């Protein structure tokens, strides 16, 4: 996934960077770095396991600890 695809996925899931980070078992800083422009020195390419999890979440999988917000399931 590209940095723009990761950000689009996070937004489609209705998650803040810290919430997606919790679901991926990483720090929020890591999510922000994966979403940053590849030309930035702090940009990070997501690990394969993270991409698989994001795709599973986009397909509708929700673990028991999925963030809950008012008006969102």
Indicate residue ranges for each PLM-predicted region.
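A short, Lys/Arg-rich alpha-helix, primarily the initiator
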Residues: 1-12
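Short, charged recognition helix plus adjacent turn
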Residues: 39-40, 56-73
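Conserved hydrophobic/aromatic packing and binding residues within compact polymer-binding modules
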Residues: 6, 20-21, 31-34
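Short, basic-rich loop-to-helix N-cap that marks the start of a DNA-contacting helix
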Residues: 38-55
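The DNA-contacting recognition helix of HTH DNA-binding domains
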Residues: 17-18, 28
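Recognition helix of helix-turn-helix/homeodomain-like DNA-binding domains
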Residues: 25-43
């Amino acid at each position: 996934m590209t940095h723009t695809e990761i950000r689009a996925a996070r937004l489609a899931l209705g998650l803040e960077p810290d919430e997606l980070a919790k679901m991926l078992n990483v720090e929020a800083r890591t999510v922000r770095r994966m979403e940053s422009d590849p030309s930035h020195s702090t940009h990070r390419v997501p690990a394969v396991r993270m991409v698989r999890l994001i795709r599973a979440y986009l397909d509708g999988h929700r673990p028991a600890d999925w963030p809950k917000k008012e008006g969102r399931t």
